[in-house]
Amino acid sequence: MKKLTIGSAVYDDFEGVYFTYQSLRLNTQDIWEDLEFIVVDNNPESVEGKAVKQFCEASQQVRYIPYVEKRSTAIRNEIFKNSESKFCMSIDPHVLFEPATIHKLIAFFDLHPETNNLYHGPMLYDQIKGHDPCSNMKPEWRDNMFGTWGYDKRGNNPYGNPFEIEMHGLGMFACRTEAWLGFNENFRGFGGEEGYIHKKFKKAGHTTICLPFLRWLHRFQRPRGVQYPLITEERIRNYAIGHKELGWDDKEMREHFKSKHPKIDVDKIIDDLECT
């Protein structure tokens, strides 16, 4: 069995996939035997999807899995379902790591082989140095999303001890493969997962941990525009599904989306869901 699967769900982001996985492979050549790479393509018939497939095949190492049953960022579940490793890490297909980060992560998991916790690391901004990395997210609503970037001084020192956090962005997260609790299979489109999956682990008696050494860069810029559809009604529905599953009070969620989208019947979307 491999030690770690690293995988991404992708929708028309060939360049992200190429540079992310080539960077990973270049920096881990001495431990390839411990690693598995997976790309789950949610738009495999597009020009970019076909290019992603060709790259994965040419790499002779990255496993390509087309997935068209639904369009959703929650298809990251498929990374864990298809993993053949003891541990699994999901990353956005436009994330980069510092040298030796993957080695350190494997060493950490070797010391905690039966952990059921969910793991994150500090996110760096483009300048890399000279700022406080985002070590967590704060549980608050802003701009149609639950969670705003937060900072904890304990995340500034990459040699520091792991510490508990409430939630984080899902550009990168990891856990023991069999411990993955999964995103709700009814999620569609984009959104609804931050906070939800962390609460799900907490309700199961587990913890979300920030590993200060697990530092990552995320490309936010999209000069060609966002390639996947962003449908507000789908996002509201996802949050409603998650709130219902976890038994959360949805008052704050309703108020947020009503204030942002007065022309959308937010209550109907949520209440119709409750009747299904």
Regions found by a protein language model. Give the residues of each.
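Short aromatic/hydrophobic "clamp" motif used to bind/position activated sugar donors
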Residues: C88
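Short, acidic, metal-binding catalytic loop of nucleotide-sugar glycosyltransferases
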Residues: Q22-D34
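A recurrent flexible, glycine/aromatic-enriched loop bordering the glycosyltransferase active site
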Residues: Y151-A174
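Cell-envelope/extracellular polymer assembly enzymes that use nucleotide-activated donors
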Residues: K2-G7, S23, E36, Y196
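Conserved donor NDP-sugar-binding/catalytic core segment of glycosyltransferases
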Residues: A100-N144
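A conserved acidic beta->alpha catalytic loop
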Residues: V39-V52
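A conserved hydrophobic helix/loop-capping motif in glycosyltransferases and polysaccharide synthases
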Residues: L4-D13, T20, N27, V40, ...
